[in-house]
Amino acid sequence: MTTEQLKQRTFKFGVRIVHAVEALPRTETARILGRPLLRAGTSVGANYRAAARARSRADFIAKLGIVEEECDEAAFWMELIVAVKLLKRARLASLCAEASELLAIVVASIKTARRSHRV
């Protein structure tokens, strides 16, 4: 997957996160759980863009680490939202799967970058 393709994929992930948060019921609990999901989920794409513009290999690795953390955090909030029954599992299943796939891609990229950084 190219950098540009991953930029587009993380952007679309952010858009889907926004729609998922908008689908939450209008309750205090949903608002409290939706805000960090919105922040983490949309920052995946923003931080990946920053990583793509990194000035050094070390900077790239550090910024990808932030992408990894934000993606994992978004997955956590989605799991919690399903667990407390604010949204049905089916509503978030493909979004959770996308978070897992993006996380795997980012982790693999970090490992590859670290190996080539040491050489």
Descriptions of predicted regions:
Residues 1-119:
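Short, C-terminally biased terminal segments at protein or domain edges
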